[in-house]
A protein has these predicted regions:
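Acceptor/aglycone-binding surface of glycosyltransferases and processive sugar-polymer synthases
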Residues: 64-68, 72-82, 99-180
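Short, well-formed alpha-helical segments that are part of the catalytic scaffolds
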Residues: 8-27
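A conserved acidic beta->alpha catalytic loop
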Residues: 37-49, 95-96
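Short aromatic/hydrophobic "clamp" motif used to bind/position activated sugar donors
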Residues: 88
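Hydrophobic targeting segments
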Residues: 1-3, 12, 19, 34-39
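Catalytic metal- and UDP-sugar-binding loop of GT-A-like glycosyltransferases, i.e.
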Residues: 66, 91-93
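Conserved donor nucleotide-binding strand/loop of the catalytic core
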Residues: 27, 34-37, 48-82, 119
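Donor nucleotide-sugar binding loop of glycosyltransferases
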Residues: 8-11, 43, 98
Length: 181
């Protein structure tokens, strides 16, 4: 899993606990090992200290620290560049995307899909402002861009290693993850 974080000191350990609970409950169905790659995007709170602590505490956790905030896209690409697994899944640590969806994504992968997008069907927990800004963003973007974005599809997706390798081979220096699919 690729986990970009910025000032997430309050959510990191909770995410790890929830992920381990999910993994241990579904280990019989999930035939894969895992790695958690946290990318600290220049956090100004205690995120760096917490990540250093969990790095030493857990075997399957790797941590990258940016010297300043470079933005989520750069954090995602740093995570892709450092991932060693055959399946890569970016996800936010705030758990707005439910972990159980990973099982469904893995099922699609086993059916032969190289990329599996997760789409939010329920935004009831989002504030009015969040819902409205997301709606405006997708409407505006899709009016001006050649490649359309599927509304309510974020960075939570499964990508096969060969897809990630092709992304990493792109010569662009301003990649927009959602715009690639």
């Amino acid at each position: 899993l690729i986990l970009p974080v910025y000032n997430e000191k309050d959510t990191i350990e909770y995410f790890i606990n929830q992920f381990l609970l999910f993994f241990n409950q579904t280990i019989d169905q999930i035939k894969y090992s895992y790695e958690l790659i946290f990318i600290n995007d220049g956090s100004t709170d205690q995120t760096a200290e917490i990540l250093t602590q969990v790095f030493h505490q857990y075997e399957h956790i790797n941590v990258l620290h940016f010297s300043r905030n470079f933005g989520k896209e750069n954090a995602l690409f740093a995570g892709l560049d450092n991932a060693i697994g055959d399946i890569i899944i970016p996800i936010d640590v705030d758990l707005q995307d439910p972990l159980h969806v990973i099982s469904a994504m893995l099922n699609k992968y086993e059916e032969g899909y190289d990329v599996v997008l997760a789409k939010r069907v329920n935004r009831n927990k989002d504030s009015y402002l969040k819902k409205k800004s997301a709606e405006l963003f997708y409407n505006f973007y899709n009016k001006i861009a050649e490649v359309k974005l599927e509304p309510n599809v974020g960075d939570f997706r499964l990508m096969d290693r060969k897809v990630v390798d092709e992304i990493l081979n792109l010569q662009e220096n301003q990649l927009f993850m959602k715009g690639l699919f």
